[in-house]
Design a protein with these regions (language model features):
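Elongated, amphipathic alpha-helical interaction scaffolds
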Residues: 1-296
Length: 296
């Protein structure tokens, strides 16, 4: 397979930006958590998701732009509803970041500190301090295996016989390379279809075409029920194709994308989307990775 064009067409942080922007939609978030926490996902109330800005963090540490924080109500087994903080730390680089586990702790401690300060200001006499449950997920879409520390105990250096005195935090690591393309294609919902195309990005010509077309055909069901989300996910799939596949493959892939849709309106939309994305990236020199307002 010929080498893809230089990555300046869609910059290095493009995968993180795709993940971050699409997960802002509550249904996409739900579909991701269904893969990560299948036994718990139905207890979260995704109609009440609140994205949390990094403004609550300490002034000298604002976290990382690609990290996502959500407050989501959770209905426990006894019917009690409690807010839960979900951290999603996205990583794509070839060399995993050894500070990732530490970031998850800093987010948790900042959230707990905020809750503590609010409690000090407003709590009634006799009311005990209670902190949110934190669910930390590392979403790794890089090409290799995660080799950096997976827990604080691995990160903290020191005598092994003192390790039990250190803090404990064990994020869930969800690695895209461990997911089969077909399991993503067959999963319920639209967001896994986008992940399937990401997963197949470096595959053979034939395999990528198969996954690309299958994902777009499955996504078409959203066009009539949730068109905004359909547009977002299809744009993400087309952008990923532009980033990962060689220039000489694009005309055929664009033709396949158009033909994958049954409705004429959707075919025209697909063709227009590709032209708009490509023209913006190439002719106008638009830096899609750095532009904060990237419209997926």
């Amino acid at each position: 397979m010929a080498e893809p064009e230089p990555p300046d067409l869609l910059p290095r942080d493009f995968p993180d930006k795709i993940i971050r922007q699409t997960l802002q939609h509550p249904q996409n978030l739900r579909e991701f958590l269904a893969r990560v926490l299948p036994e718990h996902v139905d207890r979260f109330d995704f109609s009440q998701v609140v994205p949390l800005s990094r403004e609550f963090l300490t002034a000298d540490w604002r976290g990382r732009e690609a990290d996502l924080l959500f407050v989501v109500p959770y209905h426990g087994p006894q019917g009690r509803e409690q807010d839960c903080l979900i951290e999603i730390l996205t990583e794509h680089q070839t060399s995993p970041d050894s500070s990732t586990v530490l970031r998850s702790l800093l987010y948790a401690s900042s959230s707990w500190e905020t809750a503590w300060l609010e409690w000090k200001k407003r709590h009634e006499r006799g009311e005990e301090l209670r902190l949110r449950t934190i669910v930390c997920i590392v979403l790794y879409t890089g090409p290799g295996t995660w080799t950096a520390p997976r827990s604080l105990s691995e990160l903290v250096a020191g005598p092994a016989d003192l390790a039990r005195f250190g803090p404990r935090l064990d994020p869930i690591f969800w690695e895209l390379r461990d997911q089969s393309v077909d399991s993503l294609l067959s999963a319920l919902g639209g967001w896994p279809k986008m992940l399937a195309v990401m997963r197949a990005g470096a595959s053979s010509v034939e395999e990528f075409e198969r996954v690309f077309v299958a994902a777009l055909r499955e996504l078409e069901a959203l066009a009539g029920t949730d068109r905004i989300r359909w547009l977002e996910l299809v744009r993400a799939v087309l952008m990923w194709m532009i980033r990962m596949r060689p220039r000489e493959e694009r005309p055929r892939l664009t033709k396949l994308a158009v033909e994958s849709q049954n409705q004429q309106e959707d075919r025209l939309e697909m063709e227009t989307m590709y032209e708009t994305i490509y023209d913006a990236a190439v002719k106008q020199g638009l830096d899609l990775g750095r532009k904060e307002g990237l419209d997926l």
